[in-house]
């Protein structure tokens, strides 16, 4: 039993990451960013984790937050979207001294009423650099703002406005110090983890924090489910920081390919049989 738990622990451990290689890769990525024509202030660093199979459990693919050691957001115009009682939450924002950060509070009914056209939704999107969403209505945001948010890769942060253990102010502070994490429906998962303006040490700490959170909370089988891990910017090539054993990876990809194969339809089976019988006659 002890061996099993030790194996599980190893599957979640960061010991597999070569820290010296990671430091070297971070330096290489930052050098690439500085040599490009783009302003360094606008470049962001992402961690990309490729798994052998999609993470099937739906609860693990819900939007979540990862608290980072080094802040990556500087927000001055946040919008808070709540289920209802817009004025109540507007008053709460002012009472807790959040009105310098949260400049607009919208209820879902108000959002539906006031922002109907694509143009109106784009104006709302472009007026704010962060969207905080009541976790009770987070599932409605893709329906109401989907394509408009997707165009600019806007990812709303879930927040529990009914939380009694933690004030709204503290929750907002945690959001500002966090990154957005949502596993994709496929096998490639990309998470923002740093800024090009941060130091190598800050990026290292943020990257390892995100990776540890993924292994512990979102990828049940840990390293055994991961094909490779890399870091990148939005436009750069992925720079690998860990790759699974080549033979094992090839074997697992083969298994996944077989599992994902679509069963043949009856018409396709009949056509296949006709083809086989035709070949047999020809050979005679």
From Swiss-Prot:
Places the protein is found: Nucleus, Nucleolus
Gene3D superfamilies the record matches: 3.30.190.20, 3.40.50.790
Stretches for region Disordered: 264-284
Molecular function as annotated in GO: RNA binding
One Gene Ontology cellular component annotation held by this UniProt entry: nucleolus
Keywords of this entry: Nucleus, Ribosome biogenesis, rRNA processing
Keyword Transferase: no
Record-linked InterPro entries: Ribosomal_uL1-like, Ribosomal_uL1/biogenesis, Ribosomal_uL1_3-a/b-sand
GO terms, biological process: ribosomal large subunit biogenesis; rRNA processing
Record Pfam families: Ribosomal_L1 (PF00687)
Protein family according to the UniProt entry: Belongs to the universal ribosomal protein uL1 family. Highly divergent.
Described purpose of this protein according to its UniProt entry: Involved in rRNA-processing and ribosome biosynthesis.
Subunit details: Component of the 90S pre-ribosomes.
The protein's name: Putative ribosome biogenesis protein C306.07c
Natural source organism: Schizosaccharomyces pombe (strain 972 / ATCC 24843)
